[in-house]
Regions:
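Binding-site signature for planar aromatic cofactors or substrates
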Residues: 1-135
Length: 135
């Protein structure tokens, strides 16, 4: 069994669909949610996205919030929820990756890169296993 959390099917869906990212705010527990069009697979255990606005999502991450990402393939009633630990990078290899991604995709230079260590993966496939942890 591989130690890699992100299998080929997951990586493909992340590349083809717009992931939705949620973070939890402080003690209040109020969720913050939004699409992350720059979210992509970094390697078999990490996701990465460019933070462009420096708004509530970044603030929540700086306050220690975990992160949850949902990606769905609605026509096929399939999807995944990834739960992970985010790290903010203002320079170095991860930031360089974000800058290059922005340049390659006609985006503004990001304020920072957010690298997410995937801790858990859940299936969102319709049926009796929906919501079960798979990695």
């Amino acid at each position: 069994m591989s130690d890699q959390k992100l299998n080929d099917a997951m990586q493909s869906m992340l590349a083809e669909q717009t992931p939705i990212l949620a973070t939890v705010i402080k003690e209040s527990g109020m969720p913050n949610i939004g699409p992350k069009r720059s979210l992509r697979v970094y390697d078999g255990n990490h996701l990465i996205f460019n933070e462009n606005t420096g708004g509530q999502t970044l603030e929540n991450i700086k306050q220690g919030s975990k992160i949850a990402i949902a990606v769905i393939d609605r026509p096929n009633l399939d999807g995944y929820r990834f739960v992970g630990t985010p790290e903010v990078h203002l320079d170095g290899v991860f930031y360089d990756n974000a800058v290059q991604y922005a340049a390659d995709n006609g985006m503004k230079t990001p304020k920072c890169a957010v690298l997410i260590k995937v801790d858990e993966v859940y299936t969102l496939k319709s049926g009796p296993t929906a919501g079960q942890q798979i990695a």
